[in-house]
Amino acid sequence: MHYPEPITKLMDSFMKLPGIGPKSAARLAFYVLDMKEDDVLDFAKALVDAKRNLSFCSVCGHITDKDPCYICSDTSRDRSVLCVVQESKDVIAMEKMRDFHGLYHVLHGTISPMDGIGPEDINIPDLLKRLQDDTIEEVILATNPNVEGEATAMYISRLLRPSGIKVTRIAHGLPVGGDLEYADEVTLSKAMEGRREV
């Protein structure tokens, strides 16, 4: 299908986003064309403002509009516990839980030798510098339960073993409301491993 050049450029821009193929890009492009001009300008401004005004916290690596971020600046948080996550969106998910009151460290990825990503390519060197502060007593490894997440957690765990800092891994298992019959073997295995006394 031949589209006018402005639509093609808009579709190409949308296809740079994850999960957006040609059909979704066309649908989004035509939706934008149907929007009021003020709404389109507000949308474009929001994109530019987000890109210009957001950066990563110099302490934890979380996305922020001020440095240090609101979490690192909060003096009421437990500074003896550090939760290591892959991405800023993981911090947001953990904060929604409202159960964790410690600090975070965002890795911005995982170790993935197949993709040429090693420990020095993610935020591990800054983690090690941060742990030189004697106030941190426990590091919780909260990377995703996939091959890369597990490899990253194992690597960090081995690095920290000589330090004497307690290193824990979040349990993985069945979601609340999930049925055993629909769970895969890895999920069931992790659920059994992560069991606790009641």
Curated annotation (Swiss-Prot):
This is Recombination protein RecR. It comes from Listeria innocua serovar 6a (strain ATCC BAA-680 / CLIP 11262). It comes from the Bacteria. GO terms for molecular function: DNA binding; zinc ion binding. The keyword Lipoprotein does not apply. It holds the Pfam family RecR_C. A zinc finger (C4-type) spans 57-72. May play a role in DNA repair. It seems to be involved in an RecBC-independent recombinational process of DNA repair. It may act with RecF and RecO. Coiled coil: none annotated. GO terms for biological process: DNA recombination; DNA repair. Residues 80-175 form the Toprim domain. Belongs to the RecR family. The keyword Heme does not apply. The gene is recR. Keywords: DNA damage, DNA recombination, DNA repair, Metal-binding, Zinc, Zinc-finger.
